[in-house]
Every structure is written in structure tokens, then in C-alpha cells.
């Protein structure tokens, strides 16, 4: 009987061990990240409705990935509080409510107003330049987005985030800025909800202009009060139009 050599394993009907080599970890991680980003966008932009069930099989077909990849992406979204999971009930998109929006807004006000106060009092010339440049980019989008929120919201959202981050960038607390980044992302679904109704209810462009001017004037008291009103205005729009309970 002839002994089979290692090379003979690759011939005939036998499959090479090399053919069954595992997928590189980097590729697996990038696929999970891509699925996470697509899922997140579908949730935040409302294609997967708040409170709706997220069936693994449906998501596998939707994103053309394995069940394991879907579960990993969903776990990341659970950590981001955009998805909830319960025993025997599977995964669901985290519901939206007026109480949740109020809670997020109140927490954001408490942290962001203090971070803004520190920045206004301590910011240097580089901070001023960042505030001015980020405001300029945002102002170019403010009025256009109010006229066409559906198509321009993603651009406006990034510019709006850049402006708010610029305002508090001279705050010395890295933890405060980190928590505010989380809160800002959590409120994105609510900002999208109110964007469709802002035009008759408020002038967001004027609110941003007033924030910029008071920040550059180093008027910490006025600037923080304007920020509080700016954040609370979104709640007023939701209540005015009965968008949430």
C-alpha cells in the first residue's frame, strides 16, 4: 500500500487543507463593522421603525451576510442602545418616546452647558477659528436643509455635530466630551424626526448664529442659556406636532 504524502492530499477528489483556511480576522471585523453601519443607518433614518422586531433571517437576506455577522452587529447596536434584546423575544429596535427624549435632552443640557461655559472662558485663538469655520459650513446648509430636509439631512447632521463639538472643544474634561458624543448620537433619531417640522416652528439658522456670536463675545452666561433653549426647542416641536407620546 502506498502511503499518502502531504502533497497527495491536494490531488484527485481530496480538498486541500489550504482551501479550508479561516477567513482573516481583519476581514471578519470589517464585514461586521459594515453590517453594523448599515443597520445603524437603517434604524436612525427610520427604515427599520422604532419598536420593530429584528429577525435574524430577515436581516441575513437584507444585508447578504451570515447569521453570525448579523448577531455581532446587533450586539454592537445593543451596546449603543439602538437595539434591545430580551430572552425569548429576540432583538427589537429601541422604542422612541417623549420621556426618553426629555431625559436625553436634560442630561445633554447639564453636561454640554458646563462644557460650553468652560470653552467660552478658556478657549484660545485656535478654538475661535474652529468655531468660526464650523459655523460657516453649517450656515451654508441650515436654510437649504429646512427647505429640503429629506435629501440634505445627512450633510447637515455632520455639519451640526462639527459645530457643537467646536463650541465645547476647549473644555478640559475628556470624559465630558466622550459622554456628550454618546448623547449626541442617541438624539440623532429625534433630530431627524423634528427636521421635517422645524420650518414653521423655529429658525435653527438664527439659533446657531446667536450661539456663535455669544461664544466669540465670551459671554458664557448668555451662550449657555441659548444652548439650553436650542436643545429644548426640539422637544417643543415634538409636542407641538404630537410626534411622540
From Swiss-Prot:
One Gene Ontology term of the molecular function aspect: DNA-binding transcription factor activity
Residue ranges of DNA binding: 56-75
Superkingdom of source: Bacteria
Residue stretches making up the HTH gntR-type domain: 29-96
Keyword Protease appears in the UniProt entry: no
One Pfam family of this chain: FCD
InterPro entries xref list: GntR_C (IPR011711), TF_FadR/GntR_C (IPR008920), Tscrpt_reg_HTH_GntR (IPR000524), WH-like_DNA-bd_sf (IPR036388), WH_DNA-bd_sf (IPR036390)
Keyword tags: DNA-binding, Transcription, Transcription regulation
Membrane spanning stretches: none
Protein name, UniProt field: Uncharacterized HTH-type transcriptional regulator BphR
Gene coding for it: bphR
